[in-house]
C-alpha cells in the first residue's frame, strides 16, 4: 500500500513539474490553451519532450528542442508543408563547371533578406520562390529589395495558395503573366490567407527572364549552380519530427526521403564542419526555429532530396 501511494505521489509530482514546463512554453511561444484542448496539447507536448530528451542524449550531429511547433497536431504541421510534387519530367542541363569555393554563403554578400514567417499557411512554395528572385535581382542590380509572397499566393492560378504549390509554376507564371516583374512586400503585404489577385493595383519592380533546373539528385551540380548564379529554390522532405523540432547542428536524418518532397525552402550556400559537408538552407518559419531561421543539412547522398527539385531564376 505504501509503495502504491509513493508511486502515485511520484507521478503527481512529475505531472506537476512537466505542467510548469508546458505553462512556461505557452508563455514563451504566446500560444495559450484551455479546457479539453489544453489537455490535448499538453499530451502532445509531453510526447515531444520525451523525443527531444532521447535524441539529444544520443549526441548526434544535431539537436532538437521544444520550439513553437512542440504542441502542434500532425495535421497542423502537415499544413505548413505546401510543396506539391510535380510528376512531369524536368529538363536540366548539367553544369560544365564545378564549384570552386570550399564554402559559400550568399548572406555574406548582402543579397539575402532576413528570415520571414509563412505562419499557418502552406505557402512555403511562394517563400522559396521569392527568396530566390530577391537574391537574383540583388545580384543583378546591386540593390536588395523585399518582394511580395502574397502576390504569388493570390495570383498564381496553377498553384493553390495556402494549400500548396510549385516553385517552377510560380517562376513561369511571373514570366508569362507579370512580364517577369514583382510587387514589393511593403505594398502587397503578406496576410497568410488566400485572396484576390491585386498585382495590377501596385507598382512593379525587378525582372526575371528565365530559370534553370539543377540536374536531378546531383549535389555537385547544385553547388556549381549556386556558386555561379546565386541562392536556389529547393524542395525537401521535411515530414520528420526531427525537422519540425530542429534546433541546431548539421541535420542528418537517415529516414529522410530523396523523392517524397513536401516543403519549399532556399539554399543560400554550403560549408563544412569537422569534415562533414552541409548545405545552408533558409526556412520560412521565423527566426525562433532552428539556427535563427536556418538549418544546416548534410551534403550526402542527396539526403532529404535537397537536389531533387532545385531551381534558379535569372534576373
Residue ranges and their predicted role:
Residues 1-7:
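Classical eukaryotic N-terminal signal peptides for Sec-dependent ER targeting/secretion
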Residues 7-315:
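Catalytic-core signature of thiol
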